[in-house]
Amino acid sequence: WCRLHDIWYLKIDLEIPDVCISEAQAVYDEGFFVPHRYGDGDGWESASLHGFVPETAENTDMGWHYTKNPSGHGLTEETVKWGWTEVQEVAPETKRWLEEFPHNKYRRCRFMLLRPGGEITAHHDQHGKRHIQHASPGRPYGGTIAAAINLAFYQPDNCYLRRADTKEELPFQNCTGFWFDNGVIHEAHNASDENRFHFIIHGGSNRERKDLMKRSLAKQFGNDVLKEID
């Protein structure tokens, strides 16, 4: 339904605690953030709260600096193990929120930093996916809003994430979350003098989360939409 109506984001009907802001700052103060995806932006950094390490590692504590998919670090799905990283020590309430959020098995769950003046160049995140017929120029892979969850812990003024084709901005405010079709060509810029702290969740979908998505769809677009998707 969302793809048919070119809906590329959906606000999650769930509260995010304010403490996530201070915990994101603590992750920054402790020096956990590392540069993320060289070439796609400037001032873009990340730290994994839940992630992976090589299977030979004693535990998953050091998984915080593996912020890309396993292949991006020269690893494979078969040679890594997943779990909470030592970032949990400075972000216990964020971890608790994630444990209570509807999920099955998480993959990467990462704090994301965009520094003052930082920018993320126009890109999409559906690499290796087939270009679909009759797709719009700004949505060449006809993705799904369930592709990723983007939580805005702290969103300064003069800061945006937007579609590259229409310049439509995601309506982030502090402690709001959105399902987000990352197959849309999008870009971001932080024109403020403050750090932007977001959090991205991959994996873990289950029936309870699908019910949450239906509830969120009804809240944003009205109950009639449920008749179209059921």
Language-model region placement:
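Catalytic core of non-heme Fe(II) oxygenases with the double-stranded beta-helix
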Residues: W97-W179
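Intrinsic-disorder/low-complexity, polar/charged segments enriched in Ser/Thr/Lys/Arg/Asp/Glu/Gln
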Residues: I7-K11, A146-A148, H198
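Catalytic core of Fe(II)/2-oxoglutarate
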Residues: L151, Q155-D230
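Compositionally biased, intrinsically disordered low-complexity segments
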Residues: L10, E15, V19-S22, A135, ...
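Structured loops at beta-to-helix junctions and adjacent beta-edge loops in soluble globular domains
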Residues: R37-Y38, L49-E55, L114, Y154, ...
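Non-heme Fe(II)/2-oxoglutarate
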Residues: W1-K105, R110
